[in-house]
């Protein structure tokens, strides 16, 4: 059993990564293997709508997507984490969502039946839209989306500031516990 946390922030070691590590720790405590996959520094281009993925489970764009897609395909649970940039998820995570989503969707709904959900970090506004944006991706692709004690959102702008948001940390922790619970039930 494995859960991966994909961090869509271009800032290494920032609030989104801190929150994702916190969530993954809760999952690991329940005996599920975890892996953090930061997209910072990677080259993830947007989808060009070439439709090559409709006939082959790959993308012809030459960048860092396919090794991550293979990890997504092998994982039992996927968490997508993004800070809010201008009221939306980052371009980095959206490029991954578009392309990995199309590849999976056109190739036997490859993510259907996996567990997944979002984590969002915001300075102030845009968190609800970004949370919905990420959640809808999971829903369209047939994921089981576990609950938490609130929306999986935390507050933080300056590096490390998210650690002061006790409710946000607790929500991410409880989400992680729900992810592990659901993965274990589905694998039983």
Q: What do the predicted segments below correspond to?
A:
Residues 1, 29, 67, 139-188:
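Glycine-rich phosphate/pyrophosphate-binding loop and the adjoining helix
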Residues 1-32:
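N-terminal beta1-alpha1 ligand-phosphate binding loop
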Residues 32-42:
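A short beta-strand-loop structural module common to alpha/beta enzyme folds
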Residues 33-35, 58, 144:
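Conserved beta-strand segments of alpha/beta enzyme cores
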Residues 42-72:
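Cysteine-cluster motifs in flexible loop/terminal segments that predominantly coordinate metals
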Residues 60-144, 149-150:
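Helix-loop-strand module that forms the ligand-binding subsite of alpha/beta enzymes
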């Amino acid at each position: 059993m494995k859960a991966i946390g994909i961090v869509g922030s271009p800032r290494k070691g920032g609030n989104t990564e801190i929150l994702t590590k916190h969530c993954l720790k809760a999952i690991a405590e329940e005996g599920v293997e975890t892996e953090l996959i930061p997209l910072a520094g990677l080259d993830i281009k947007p989808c060009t709508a070439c439709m090559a993925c409709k006939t082959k489970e790959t993308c012809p764009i030459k960048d860092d997507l396919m090794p991550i897609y293979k990890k997504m395909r092998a994982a039992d649970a996927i968490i997508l984490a993004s800070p809010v940039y201008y009221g939306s998820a980052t371009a980095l995570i959206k490029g991954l969502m578009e392309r990995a989503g199309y590849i999976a969707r056109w190739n036997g709904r490859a993510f259907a039946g996996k567990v997944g959900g979002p984590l969002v970090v915001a300075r102030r506004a845009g968190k609800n839209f970004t949370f919905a944006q990420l959640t809808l991706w999971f829903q369209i692709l047939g994921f089981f989306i576990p609950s938490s004690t609130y929306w999986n959102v935390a507050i933080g702008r300056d590096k490390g500031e998210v650690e002061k948001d006790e409710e946000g940390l607790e929500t991410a922790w409880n989400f992680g516990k729900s992810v592990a619970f659901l993965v274990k039930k589905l694998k039983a």
